[in-house]
């Protein structure tokens, strides 16, 4: 670099300017290079840590007893836009009401008897049930049954990036249930009141029961499925059939016994949790052997494929940021030759 150019760049910097030629990448790049890598979390380690948290972390210390699946490539989060957590609520405990700009989902892993209350509607939950908590909805949890563990998925990293992270504790501390059981199913399902007004952006809070999911899997399990992901079920917005939340799509993937998928990549980042089964996944140059309870993340534009090495079906709970990529016209997919 010439002394004249160096002096000019210093002059630009002093006035809060920067030359395009100072961009290290410039015009040399041709495709996305993710800023974070893949990562694999072992379920046995996560659940052991959560059991210990249940002994030493009270709800007087932490508003929620939560352990984050932290990607060491990032300052925070599981991917650049999403975070997956594990939460524990012990019998007799109440997690107090609050609301936040981040949209959230809950996938129940263990136990029965916890009520997830969202916007005045109570959802009784058990293992395999899936509940949405859309952005800026009041929500609290009550456990009147067994010890419960569930996955929390949030778009909090995206909200922090956008710097729109509003958060509000509920002065009531706990919500009063104001809606009858099955209210949302009756007002936002295939049949709904003609006068009901719906939010065109945010879906209602909704509970997808595992019995219904399992029944659907049994009906479509003999279909060819997707060559890259196996059998895929979308947790669809009950109002318009769109993605689960505006920024997040959640799915169930099933790999039949011995099934091997083809390799592909896409501009959405994807988080997998092994709900059932065992197998192996290849993410870029990484090989992950997984079993029930494990989780792993596939960064955007990373080739990946899966193999079910067992004699029984393997089932993933999956969340991704494809709706965000679709909304801004950035979604692309590429199959490996």
Model-derived segments and spans:
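Conserved short histidine dyad/triad with adjacent acidic residue
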Residues: 65-74, 82-99, 232-239, 251-265
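Contiguous mid-protein beta-loop-alpha structural module that forms a pocket-lining wall or clamp
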Residues: 131-188
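Conserved hydrophobic/aromatic beta-strand scaffold that supports enzyme active sites
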Residues: 66, 84-88, 105, 122, ...
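Conserved metal-binding segment of the jelly-roll/cupin
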Residues: 118, 124-145, 150, 155, ...
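A short beta-strand-loop-beta hairpin characteristic of the jelly-roll/cupin
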Residues: 90, 94-127, 137, 265, ...
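A short, N-terminal "cap"/entry segment at the start of jelly-roll beta-barrel domains
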Residues: 1-80, 169-170, 175-247, 332
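C-terminal functional regions that serve as terminal interaction/effector modules
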Residues: 1-42, 239-246, 250, 254-257, ...
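A short hydrophobic beta-strand segment most commonly corresponding to one strand
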Residues: 105-107, 132, 145-165, 272, ...
């Amino acid at each position: 670099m010439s002394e004249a150019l160096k002096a000019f760049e210093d002059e630009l910097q002093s006035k809060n300017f920067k030359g395009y030629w100072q961009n290290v990448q410039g015009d040399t790049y041709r495709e996305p290079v993710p800023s974070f890598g893949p990562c694999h979390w072992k379920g046995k380690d996560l659940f052991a840590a959560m059991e210990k948290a249940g002994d030493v972390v009270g709800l007087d210390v932490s508003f929620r007893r939560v352990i984050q699946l932290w990607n060491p490539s990032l300052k925070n989060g599981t991917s650049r836009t999403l975070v997956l957590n594990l939460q524990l609520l012990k019998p007799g405990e109440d997690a107090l009401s609050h609301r936040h700009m981040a949209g959230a989902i809950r996938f129940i892993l263990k136990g029965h008897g916890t009520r997830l209350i969202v916007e005045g509607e109570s959802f009784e939950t058990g293992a395999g049930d899936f509940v949405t908590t859309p952005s800026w909805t009041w929500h609290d949890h009550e456990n009147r049954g067994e010890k419960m563990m569930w996955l929390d998925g949030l778009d909090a990293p995206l909200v922090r990036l956008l710097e729109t992270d509003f958060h509000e504790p509920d002065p009531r501390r706990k919500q009063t249930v104001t809606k009858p059981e099955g209210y949302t199913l009756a007002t936002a399902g295939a049949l709904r009141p003609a006068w009901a007004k719906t939010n065109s952006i945010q879906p209602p809070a909704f509970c997808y029961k595992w019995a219904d999911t399992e029944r659907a899997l049994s009906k479509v399990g003999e279909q060819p499925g997707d060559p890259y992901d196996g059998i895929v079920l979308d947790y669809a917005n009950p109002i318009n059939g769109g993605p689960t939340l505006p920024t997040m799509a959640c799915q169930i993937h099933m790999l039949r016994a011995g099934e091997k998928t083809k390799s592909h990549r896409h501009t959405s980042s994807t988080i997998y949790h092994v709900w059932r089964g065992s197998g192996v996944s290849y993410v870029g140059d990484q090989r992950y052997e997984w079993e029930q309870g494990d989780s792993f993340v596939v960064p955007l534009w990373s080739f990946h494929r899966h193999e079910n090495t067992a004699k029984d079906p393997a089932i993933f709970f999956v969340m991704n940021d494809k709706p965000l990529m679709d909304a801004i016209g950035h979604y692309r997919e590429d199959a490996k030759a």
